[in-house]
Amino acid sequence: MPTLQKKASLPDETIEQIRFLEVHSGRVHKLLSESYPVSNINEFMTIYAERLPEEERGADRDSTDRLISCFHYEKEPSKYHGVPFVFLLKEGEIFKETKERLSKRTGIKGKQLDKVKFAVIRGGQAYARPAYVDDEDILSEKMASDDQLALEHTNKTRSPWAIYERLNIR
């Protein structure tokens, strides 16, 4: 972390608000600590750096709130797209309120947000059957510690390779 800070000329306040995520197959594999050795990072992993959201910086460390992994997919959880992220799950919060916070976090709003289906993926397994979440549900009660929240919606940034495959399959 100090090397990154020096190379990017980042002040101490900024570097303290950055978190590193190790991602594989479109899902957050783990959060990397400041002391995590670079030599331990697998070459097949992607590393994302993100600024800590405001709500996490002000979160009470003694509360039962926890961080969960989230990812985007289309039709099947194994068809992931976009950048996965970590989100603060508040204990006892109804999903309608959680969805509003997710909207702020992802930038998905209005009609686009209405098209998104939210599902819990048990154990974070790519081939697990999604357990869809309703607005009245309390997400903290539906999710175990190793579950992930999935956002099902169309991939707006399709690669040319996906188009090529689609044309040749027909």
Question: Residue spans of the language-model regions?
Answer:
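Cross-family signature of deubiquitinases and ubiquitin-like deconjugating cysteine proteases
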Residues: 1-170
